Amino acid sequence: MKLVVSCSSVQTIVDILDESEGENSISTLGQLRERIAADNDVDAETMKLLHRGKFLQGEADVSLSTINFKENDKIIVMGGKNAMADDAGFKMLMQYEKHNLSNLQKTYDVNLKDVADLERGFLEKPKQVEMGKKLEKKVKFFNEEAERHLETLDGMNIITDATPDNQAKRNREKRKTLINGIQTLLNQNDALLRRLEQYMSILNGDILE
């Protein structure tokens, strides 16, 4: 189940109660607070989480299955000092997310809209074919760009000998969150490419509608 977390002007997605994650699954209130704190550079002890007009309260071991969450529910983060603002590794990840990964999501959204527009069939067939070829290049280039971001994140030196263990854990979790987000976009983009290729096959007469 996905939750939309809003902190200041930034929104992130957190997957909860995902059995496929195994030991890394977020299933308790404490785990949810830790993930949100790591993703948003706030202090888990002082922040407050607002859900449907009420603050989420309870011990760390409270199961999230007992809370009335629904798909894409919104959680608003309030308070919480910048506990990790001075850590160079965490700051590096936050800056990379702000200046690169938000643009990656926007690029995917544009490609998704363009493919949907093409499928409506408002253009004459020759123009549809031309537009489809251009879109195919853009969608394939998205994969290349996303892979480069994965390589960059993997190569970042976010932990040094002087990094405290707790901070090192948070830095790793933050990088994992960013990588998981990119991999999700890659999976969605692969599905979009298959969808586009199928439509192009219909246009070219290889597949009958």
From Swiss-Prot:
Disulfide bonds: none annotated. SMART domains: BAG. Residues 7-84 form the Ubiquitin-like domain. Gene3D superfamilies: BAG domain (1.20.58.120), Phosphatidylinositol 3-kinase Catalytic Subunit, Chain A, domain 1 (3.10.20.90). One of its GO terms (biological process) is protein stabilization. Keywords: Chaperone. It comes from the Eukaryota. The keyword Chaperone applies. The BAG domain probably mediates direct interaction with HSP70. This is BAG family molecular chaperone regulator 1. It comes from Caenorhabditis briggsae. The gene is bag-1.
